[in-house]
Amino acid sequence: MKYQNILEEELKNKVGHDYFAAYNHTDIIERIDFAVAHPETFFGQKHYFLWAEAKRANFDIYKALAQLVLTIGKARTFERLLPPNYLGVFNSQLIAFIPYWEVQDIFTQNDFNWSVTPSDHNTAEFEQVYNRVKNILERNAYHFRFGTDDKELHTFIKENFVIGKTSTNKIYK
């Protein structure tokens, strides 16, 4: 395992350095763990490619992604910043991406209780988001194992973290 026995902060630093060195990966956006933006601003705005949840060890990526969606929805981050192309999650073993548009409609639900704590995995809201992101990740995720799929991960980032790109180039392993 490439990132064995390290703390979450160190994991974020190493993933940023190893895979996103060509981008700005040092921004801290409210409670979002990890963000990747184009290194230059455009008309004073940053263009984000990724907002991600980072978890150490072998944390459940479905729970982590559900937590990220709840974090973004609770803070209404998408109202202050242009949303990224992708939402993602990584732990010490792998990284996974989903297109932001796949979950965008969750944020506009009228009857959704956004006051829940994103890390409380026992709420009806968490369960709803968890089931949704699990379904998306199982059928339409782009996931890569650190160490094993490094070449494919670098290719995915190079081909898809491009300003103005509206579709995803799938990378076959």
Task: Set out the residue ranges of the language-model regions.
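Acidic-basic catalytic patches of nuclease active cores, encompassing PD-(D/E)XK
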Residues: 1-29
